[in-house]
Amino acid sequence: MASPSKTGECGDGEEIEALDSVHVDTLLKAVENAGQKSGCTIRIFEKNDFYYFFQSDADLAASFTYGSTAALKTMGKKTPVSFCVMNYSNFESLLRHLLLVRAFRVEIFKFLAGKGGSVPSYQLEVRASPGNISAIEHILYGEGGEGEQGASESNFLVAIKVIPGTDSGQLSLGLAAVDVSLNVVRVADLQDNQHLPALEAILVQLGPREVLLPQTESAAVKKISELVSRNKILGTERPSKEFSSLSETEINRMFSSKSNTSELVKSDSLSCGALSSVCKFLNIDTATTSTKFYLEPLSSSTTMRLTGRTMKSLNVFPSPTNPNQPSIFSILNQTRSPGGGRLLSQWLKTPLLDSVMIKERLNLVELMVTNTEMRQLLWEDHLRKFPDFQRLSAKFGSSKATLQDMYKVYVAVAKLEGLISCLQDHNGEEADNFVTLQDNFIKDLQEANKDFEKFQQMVETTLDLKQVEQGHFMIRPGRSQ
């Protein structure tokens, strides 16, 4: 049994919490009470920022964190159980690896001290999966939601509802993709054949880490499950009843007034049933939610259809297990912000087919490449303080934004006039270049600059900007909260 009184070591001399006999018994009982689990689920037991892993989970944790299983210890007298323990810093790295690279599900149990004569215990506090990371996003990406690893990626959770068609081999599919970190929903109703080329193209386009499928013995669902697995995506079965459609009232409550929900509310919309499944999985109460989502179109008809094998053979993106591997994305990714990284990723996943759109995009790229002065000004000055607006917008929409988030937006908005002037002064000699810049950037930036005038005034009269310079984000004295 582990030492009952002394602080021990794990891995490379890492100090771990002392284990007494009472805590050992509590841990072993918690492991037993947690019951059976799948091989794709990792259970973690936390007390005072120390994290315990048992049996096969301990093998995996020790191998990743310490490079071998030599760090494993055992606890228990009658039936010794192998375990591994680590501090928060190592847990943070391991959690990213488990969810973002290995696509495991994670359950975290929190220690509860006994009160009023009750015995201490462990209680399930967090259940996360690759497509449901909102509860631990601050660990994966940092408190600001803009950590380097993964911040430039979308994190869509996808659900698929399927009905076999009348023609042999034809399928009717409804797909819903939700990214709660961006408050974005994308839906599609499509017809596909038994080889599922249209579905695979959309999955490549979205790049989800997890897909929800109805729990059924249907041959069609089995084929979709095989496709999901082949593309290294975690497939999760959910009860078929969760795929029942949302009501029109629920849809209107869920989406912003700018979202066109006319197709979604149709009675024959399979994507509405898929969206219902995602909402239930993410615990989004569609009857009472105050968070407003943005509905975006999802289609593969205007872009080249790519398969997972094509993306891999062309080495478009680095392997999740080897992020430093050279790839097309890593060569091209000289973006200044996480939002820019997401846009580049989307461009690579969805090559255009329309010649007019291709020409416009190439004109933009050529303008940036040939105009060195403008490119350097944008990179070194105007875009330097730009935060991840999409994630911040979602935080404001969910009433989770802090004073620091407000200040980040304020600083970025203050740079808009200079950014607009830079684009206007360096639009090139050709008229087409000016029109392209106007339509793609300048008009929208001018509109945003005007819209944020009152926001700037509010920040200047509400935040104590002198304290902000010292790193303290506070309301001005005399102002109400």
Residue ranges, per PLM feature:
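A short structural micro-motif
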Residues: L353-S355, L416
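Basic, polar low-complexity surface loops/patches
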Residues: M1-K349, V356-E373, D381, D388-A394, ...
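Charged, amphipathic alpha-helical segments characteristic of ABC-type P-loop ATPases involved
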Residues: L383-Q481
